[in-house]
Amino acid sequence: MLSLRQRVMRRGLLCGSILCGGAHARPSSAAAAGSADGRRLPPMVPPELDDAQQRLYNTIVDTRIKVISKDALFDEHGGLRGPWNPEVASPALGQHLERLATAVRTENSLEARLYEVAILVVGVHWQAQFEWYAHEKIARKAGVADAAFPLMKVGAPAERLEGVLRPDEVAVYKLALELMETKRVSAATYAETKRALGDDDRKMADLCMTMGCYSAVSKMLNMFEIALPQGEPLPFPDRG
């Protein structure tokens, strides 16, 4: 039986064949520029990748398929959705951003429910469609209360999340919101959040690095206008 990666590569090879307009054909220059299919980057599919790109593609597939659905990970060409297509386009830098994002998930001193709250605050600030689309699902699985998502999506004040989120989640939300909105964190908010996290300096550092990582991801999603899977509603429809 073929592995998931082999099935994806076979799909990419088929798309690069005569059935899709010529062996290993990239999209036209108009498509690559975004005028034909809305893309600002062409899909990075296995038949067209150099060795470094292929290694990163394989790493992303192997790690991310454990976390998100195939529809969220792969596009119709066999390329990668989300921030992963730009990462594969420039693997020398992309591999390091991917390692950081993986470390946020696997080596974070914060519980997943806490760092996912912070990631969602970042996504709302940047109005990053794919960020919210992907991480709302992950946050729900991590145990964030269903009633919190409509409030977080509109950037509600932290006070409105009290009694909806757990106290430590409210503290993380408050600090994240304050940092994104004012570019600073007050002494009172910092002290309150640190207490809520058990006076743990490592957790405070990990919280900041998590937000920094996903600020970079959100900006990449917005710059390249990364689309959601077909038929998925936009989390921020007014942004387009």
Spans of model-derived segments:
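N-terminal hydrophobic signal/anchor transmembrane helix of membrane proteins
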Residues: G79-R81, G94-E98, V117-A134, G155, ...
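Secretory/endomembrane lumenal or extracellular ectodomains immediately following the signal peptide
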Residues: S29-A112, Q230, P235-G240
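Histidine/lysine/aspartate-rich catalytic loop segments that bind and position anionic ligands
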Residues: I138-R166
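N-terminal secretory signal peptides
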Residues: M1-R7
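N-terminal export leaders
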Residues: M9-L14
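Acidic, carboxylate-rich catalytic segments that either coordinate divalent cations
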Residues: T193-R195, M204, A216, M220-G240
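Acidic/histidine-rich alpha-helical segments that form the ligand environment
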Residues: L161, L165-C208
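Short amphipathic alpha-helical segments and their helix-coil junctions
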Residues: M1, G94-N108, V154-R160, S186-A196
